[in-house]
């Protein structure tokens, strides 16, 4: 039956009215309802797949396909809004080149490092993986096996990977790509507070009187949070916004105090503000006396380069970078005294009046301050110091752990906090802030995991940058990466990463959804399920854990990373990967598979599939015969419950738009360390930084030190890399969305117009960006969103056709091991005028 638009509207209105009144429907209305049922959409909640903000979206599915999404109006984080990437979530899974079957490099029907990719079965793929790992462990020990994971792993994927590597293969060589983005934030928290993750939450935005952005372009990288900051600024005229960066970007549009500083001199500015607070009498003496102590950190700590690099050989304290000594307040005041307004203005290039206006925001006792930072701070050879120094300002003034007063580290990935940090998928960590080097922590993990003593190795494994070096050097023989694209995102691709991956001694496996640069450089590609093709959990920047159900099936033979990890564990018996002396402590485990020991261990497999909410698929439960996700989560939660990392019971999260840990007696925590908000703070104490036994936070004396590489006559420009609004990280998802790719198809070299003119170039000219390590070609942009000062260029890293990380330096913070992508020296050469 065909209806005109007018007839359709009338019939639809009749149907609604009749249904509301309980009346029988007219025949035309009945037909309409029947036809509508054929096009019915099923809507369910899920956290966004992109950044660490943790927006919730409503996902519409029909006929095993995601067909639409919109912002979740019930979500506290985004309140129904999405950024431009979020609006196109429904398209990220359906690129024409989606991987749907395992692919192995082969020649004449057998594996060959120089062969072409050919389809194989999952059994064939796992057979060669198992063969390579068994051979590597037998010949060289657990150190020969490594894994590179992700802040995009779901909580249970990261947890399963951690167990398989650290307990099953007994190798701590597992690290997430969050090493590139959040490791300095982690160590900043750990050094200052003795515990990781923010004390505040997004609610601080609506209570703050000032916002200070340190190396954070929130307008493009965290636009939903920026909309809340903007609303606060425009609706409360007394609110002020300060933005600090090495170049102007869109966040400067809202800035009352704009500050463009010379690279690395943020350390000078931070120490100047501390000095201003002291000299102006703005120290909160009562707070400082009760809740803090002072420490002098080691200096001259090197740059995390190879040991034979002259910069490392000259560094006096490279071996003890993460050490400090006690000092007094008076000694601290004397330490920061040389960081005067005059010196800071001269060396940073920022006008003195702007520096003073910034310092006054922190010093004013009547103004609540929220500090935000992301990669500008963290991707820094002194990123941990920068984190420590921003905490100094909040601690000296007592502006912390209360509504509106909040130093807040923003995250870039959806579960960099919930998986990489909280689960502990770093090479030196275990769940809930525990460390592999701590015997008590290893003992706790071994008890929870039901393992014999001594299973977990005490030596930290290779971190992300070191993994590339060890592949190149032939130390790592088997390397499995999941949910990451390090061949595009990692530093110094041509000298370190590519030679390592293509080392004839190495066997590299990539689990992904698209044929990324990394996949194309691998030996074996495994097709993965993504986002709502599996049941998942993420943890966002404000400690909010969010769950979602599996809503559709993955295409072809694609499988979730969780299935891959757990199914693969069946290929090994303990006799093949554990030494005899370890098995002697647990004779019942002899001959058992790692699957039986790690996953079918009476804990992980205790929840039957029947507990899955009716109406939802769960491919892993179907494969293994139990509710795997629930079992992994409840076992993992044992690490944190009772230790200020409390997670709610598993079933609570499917009913909520996320809960912020610690969750005690069903109540989430918005402000940590503050009495009345945090259940772990003792009554009458007001504030307790209970990460340390004395419940005091550390205020660090740390100096300015220069970057690892700076411009010179041969390479006269600074290079900074980063992102743009329309694309996320390496663009493997967003570049496959026609609207986003069409908006920004290519990475550009953002440059000051006068620098372009000096090169006899102009907007649109093609140039080479050349460093001591590699080069790329791209076109110049002298207008638009990013406005570098003279002597600096900015190039985003989303474009696989313009791999800017061929150019970058693999210098890292010696404490956090996080890469500095914001500072290296390049030269620019004109290719064509355009």
Swiss-Prot record:
Its EC number is 1.9.6.1. Disulfide bonds: none annotated. It comes from the Bacteria. It catalyses: 2 Fe(II)-[cytochrome] + nitrate + 2 H(+) = 2 Fe(III)-[cytochrome] + nitrite + H2O. [4Fe-4S] cluster binds at residues 48, 51, 55, 83. One of its GO terms (molecular function) is molybdenum ion binding. It is an enzyme of class 1 (oxidoreductase). Binds 1 [4Fe-4S] cluster. Binds 1 molybdenum-bis(molybdopterin guanine dinucleotide) (Mo-bis-MGD) cofactor per subunit. It is found in: Periplasm. SUPFAM superfamilies: ADC-like, Formate dehydrogenase/DMSO reductase, domains 1-3. Its cofactor is [4Fe-4S] cluster; Mo-bis(molybdopterin guanine dinucleotide). Residues 41-97 form the 4Fe-4S Mo/W bis-MGD-type domain. The keyword Iron-sulfur applies. GO terms for biological process: cellular respiration; Mo-molybdopterin cofactor biosynthetic process; nitrate assimilation. InterPro entries: Asp_de-COase-like_dom_sf, CT_Nitrate-R-NapA-like, MoPterin_dinucl-bd_dom, Mopterin_OxRdtase, Mopterin_OxRdtase_4Fe-4S_dom, MopterinOxRdtase_cofactor_BS, Periplasm_NO3_reductase_lsu, Prok_molybdopt-oxidoreductase. PROSITE patterns: 4FE4S_MOW_BIS_MGD, MOLYBDOPTERIN_PROK_1, TAT. Belongs to the prokaryotic molybdopterin-containing oxidoreductase family. NasA/NapA/NarB subfamily. Component of the periplasmic nitrate reductase NapAB complex composed of NapA and NapB. Catalytic subunit of the periplasmic nitrate reductase complex NapAB. Receives electrons from NapB and catalyzes the reduction of nitrate to nitrite. HAMAP family: Nitrate_reduct_NapA. This is Periplasmic nitrate reductase. It comes from Ectopseudomonas mendocina (strain ymp) (Pseudomonas mendocina). The gene is napA.
């Amino acid at each position: 039956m065909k209806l005109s638009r007018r007839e359709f509207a009338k019939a639809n209105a009749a149907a609604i009215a009749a249904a509301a009144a309980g009346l029988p429907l007219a025949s035309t209305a009945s037909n309409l309802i029947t036809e509508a049922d054929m096009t019915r959409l099923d809507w369910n909640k899920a956290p966004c797949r992109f950044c660490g903000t943790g927006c919730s979206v409503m996902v519409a599915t029909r006929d095993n396909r995601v067909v639409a999404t919109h912002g979740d109006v019930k979500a506290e984080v985004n309140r129904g809004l999405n950024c431009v990437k979020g609006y196109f979530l429904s398209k990220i899974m359906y690129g024409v080149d989606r991987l749907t079957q395992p692919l192995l490099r082969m020649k004449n029907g057998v594996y060959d490092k120089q062969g072409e990719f050919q389809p194989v079965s999952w059994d064939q793929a796992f057979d060669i993986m198992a063969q390579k790992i068994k051979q590597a462990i037998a010949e060289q020990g657990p150190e020969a096996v490594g894994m590179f994971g992700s802040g995009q792993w779901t909580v249970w994927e990261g947890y399963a990977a951690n167990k398989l590597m650290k307990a099953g293969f007994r190798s701590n060589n597992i690290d997430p790509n969050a090493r590139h983005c959040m490791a300095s934030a982690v160590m900043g928290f750990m050094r200052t507070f003795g515990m990781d993750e923010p004390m505040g939450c997004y609610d601080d935005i609506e209570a703050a009187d000032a916002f200070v952005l340190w190396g954070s372009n929130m307008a493009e990288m965290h636009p939903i949070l920026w909309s809340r900051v903007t609303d606060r600024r425009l609706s409360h005229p007394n609110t002020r916004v300060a933005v600090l960066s090495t170049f102007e970007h869109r966040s400067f549009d809202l800035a009352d105090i704009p500050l463009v500083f010379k690279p690395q001199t943020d350390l000078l500015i931070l120490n100047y503000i501390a000095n201003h607070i002291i000299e102006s009498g703005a120290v909160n003496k009562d707070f400082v006396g009760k809740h803090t102590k002072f420490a002098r950190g080691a200096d001259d700590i090197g740059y995390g380069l190879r040991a034979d690099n002259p910069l490392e050989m000259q560094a006096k304290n490279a071996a003890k970078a993460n050490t400090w000594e006690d000092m007094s307040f008076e000694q601290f005041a004397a330490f920061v005294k040389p960081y005067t307004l005059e010196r800071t203005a001269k060396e940073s290039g920022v006008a003195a009046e702007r520096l003073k206006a910034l310092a006054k925001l922190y010093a004013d006792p009547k103004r609540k301050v929220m500090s935000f930072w992301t990669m500008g701070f963290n991707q820094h050879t002194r990123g941990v110091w920068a984190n420590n120094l921003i905490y100094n300002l909040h601690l000296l003034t007592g502006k912390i752990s209360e509504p509106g007063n909040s130093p807040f580290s923003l995250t870039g990935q959806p579960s960099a906090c919930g998986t990489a940090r909280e689960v502990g998928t770093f090479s030196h960590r275990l769940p809930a802030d525990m460390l592999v080097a701590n015997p008590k922590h290893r003992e706790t993990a071994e008890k929870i995991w039901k393992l014999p003593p001594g299973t977990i190795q005490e030596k930290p494994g290779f971190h992300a940058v070191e993994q590339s070096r060890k592949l190149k050097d032939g130390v790592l023989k088997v390397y499995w990466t999941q949910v990451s694209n390090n061949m595009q995102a990692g530093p110094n691709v041509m000298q370190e990463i590519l030679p390592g991956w293509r080392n004839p001694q190495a066997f590299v496996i990539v689990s992904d959804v698209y044929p990324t640069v990394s996949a194309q450089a691998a030996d074996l590609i495994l097709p993965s399920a993504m986002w709502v093709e599996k049941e998942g959990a993420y943890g966002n920047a404000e400690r909010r854990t969010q769950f979602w159900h599996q809503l559709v099936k993955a295409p072809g033979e694609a499988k979730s990373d969780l299935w891959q990890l757990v199914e693969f564990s069946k290929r090994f018996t303990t006799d093949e990967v554990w030494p005899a002396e370890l098995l002697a402590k647990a004779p019942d485990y002899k001959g058992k598979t790692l699957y039986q020991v790690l996953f079918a261990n009476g804990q992980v497999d205790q929840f039957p599939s029947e507990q899955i909410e009716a109406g939802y698929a769960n491919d892993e439960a179907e494969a293994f015969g139990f509710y795997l996700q629930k079992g992994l989560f409840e076992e993992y939660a044992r690490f944190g419950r009772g230790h200020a990392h409390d997670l709610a019971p598993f079933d609570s999260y499917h009913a909520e738009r996320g809960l912020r840990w610690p969750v005690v007696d069903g109540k989430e925590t918005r402000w940590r360390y503050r009495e009345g908000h945090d259940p772990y703070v003792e009554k009458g104490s007001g504030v307790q930084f209970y990460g340390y036994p004395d419940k005091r936070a550390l205020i660090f004396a740390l100096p300015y030190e220069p970057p690892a590489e700076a411009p010179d006559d041969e390479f006269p420009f600074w290079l900074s890399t980063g992102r743009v609004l329309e694309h996320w990280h390496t663009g493997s998802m967003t570049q496959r969305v026609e609207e986003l790719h069409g908006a920004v198809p290519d990475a550009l070299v953002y440059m000051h117009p006068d620098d372009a003119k000096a090169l006899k170039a102009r907007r649109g000219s093609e140039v080479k960006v050349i460093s001591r390590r590699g080069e790329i070609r791209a076109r110049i942009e002298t207008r638009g969103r990013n406005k570098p000062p003279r002597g600096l260029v900015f190039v985003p890293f989303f474009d696989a056709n313009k791999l800017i990380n061929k150019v970058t330096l693999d210098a890292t913070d010696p404490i956090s091991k996080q890469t500095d992508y914001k500072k290296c020296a390049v030269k620019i050469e004109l290719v064509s005028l355009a």
